[in-house]
Amino acid sequence: MELGTVKAVITGGASGLGRATAARLIAAGARVALLDRPASAGEDVAKSFGPSAAFTPADVTSAEAVTAALDAAVAHCGGLNVLVNCAGIGTAMKTLGKSGPAKLEEFTRVIQVNLIGTFNCIRLAAPHMAKSAPGAHGERGVIINTASVAAFDGQIGQAAYSASKGGIVGLTLPVARDLAELGIRVCTIAPGLFDTPLLAGLPEPARVSLGKQVPFPPRLGRPAEYGALAAQIVENAMLNGETIRLDGAIRMQPR
């Protein structure tokens, strides 16, 4: 798919990986809707991108809110042929800690936002994509999900986060097969240590130390590098049903 023909919805688009992906696509001529929490900076971010971008507020776990946001996105973009799922949350909790067993509601919340929220957006975006005019080889859409290296190398305290991201990896191939007959591709990116809002609260020395754990390049990943890979997935029609690690060859240790 040519980037100039992209009509995209990006969840979590107000910051981090989502915002960087929006910037990459808009620079190539795409029209983009940023789907993020109503309390996010989405409105200001969309305005900063100019008329090619719009903010469509929604909670990714709500069918009603996502349906309304997608309808607004389709109206703004003139259709929908790309979905990039970047919305997500993280929490640290040991299965059994000093205060007792992990709180089930915390585990459930992470699964609800990261895994169920991703699938909710996929299932509701697919009907819009199916209405798109087919391009080369009948392609109608591309869906890109965001997992994490925690899906493979979960650390102590990451049971909920790793489970949610592992679920995204697990659904990638079957959803790609489900949607293949409609001409819709599905891939997942599993980032390593990236300079995103999830790490923003750390002191600079701690961020530098984390970056040095990466074999090469020995630094935190840049959101623009995620955006570049997302753009390459959109352009390369043979990328389908695959999870790509974007991690500088890091393999996380237990802690």
Label each residue range with its predicted role.
Residues 3-33:
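Canonical Rossmann dinucleotide-binding motif of NAD(H)/NADP(H)-dependent dehydrogenases/reductases
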Residues 127, 176-178:
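Alpha-helical segment proximal to the catalytic Tyr-Lys
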Residues 148:
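Residue(s) in the substrate-gating loop at a strand-loop-helix junction
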Residues 180, 185, 239-242:
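Short, small/polar-rich loop/turn modules that mediate ligand/substrate recognition or access, typified
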